[in-house]
């Protein structure tokens, strides 16, 4: 089975999901070229109805729990045409560069880079 509809990521910080980010690229997946070379890659707020947003967050928090993770991580997923979610991978040390998804999501809710780093360090 090949799922090619929507690629997204959900950062989790101290037990709470930050806004999901949808990744749109002309590449076949979010690879090095899509991240750093291509100018057409878009990182968009992933808009969902409340019931699907709650489902997505529960999947991500359950994934965190099953993996035994805490503090911070990022869950990468696909969503198919029937709106089902599939976990691709868990990033236990998400990127923190200017191109990285975790700080971009935090920024979208007004959490500065410095505040984000402090929350990660202090675990609060």
Regions found by a protein language model. Give the residues of each.
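Phosphate-binding site of ATP-dependent enzymes
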Residues: 3-51, 79, 86
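ATP-dependent carboxylate activation and anion-phosphoryl transfer catalytic cores
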Residues: 50-124
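Extended hydrophobic/Leu-rich segments
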Residues: 1-3, 120
